[in-house]
Amino acid sequence: KLSKGAFDFVGCTEAYFGNLLPEAPVFRLAEYTYAELRKNGGWDYMANLMGIKGVHMVARHHDFGPFHLWLSKKIDKPNLKGLHLRVAPVYTAFFKSLGATVQTAALPQIYTLMENNTVQGYGWPALGWVPPWAKVTKYRVEPGFYTSTLFTMANQKKWNSLPQDVKDVINKAAMASEAKGEPAGPEFKASLKKQHAWLEKQGVGVIEFKGAERDFWVKSAKDAAWGEVLARSPVHGPKLMKLFTK
């Protein structure tokens, strides 16, 4: 709708414009800060692809941090066989690659599905968590994977029509938000620390994979997601992988 002019500006996660651009998931897979992506050409590459679709990328204005698997039952290794999980497209391939069965469901249904054991877990970012879920969630699996990024975007024609001084104001505010929302930054780390402390008080424990199991978990997440990107975009995918990963 943004690309067709129904809206002038939109703020949303990249998961919402994957239907417009199959390469969109690379944003959640970035292993560089956004300042680094702006320097190495990664941001410009994606901005050009979005521009072709009629959308101007302004900035990444917020980040809810890494996604996690949240569970009602304990697991002792990175093997999800025997678990039925609520999923979104973001991490469906990853969870299925480790043996889970999956189903989609609207956000308001997650509590009930966990409560009645229809599902034993779900994926969700580190921040932006729904407090009542603590009653039906027992564990957060570490490490997290991907990042939950939100972007400010404009209809390309509308953006082109704006006076330069207006563009400058928008860009200045957007870039300040982009820097502030960096997961490696102090403000995000402080928010995450506060969130983890609250979860601990609610009785939500941590399952942390270490050593080879940690490496396997992280690699499985990366391989599953990039596998989808490369399959959907054989031309741009390999180039973007070089720009977005270390």
Kindly give the residue locations of the regions a language model identified.
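Core domains of carbohydrate- and sulfate-ester-processing enzymes
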Residues: 41-45
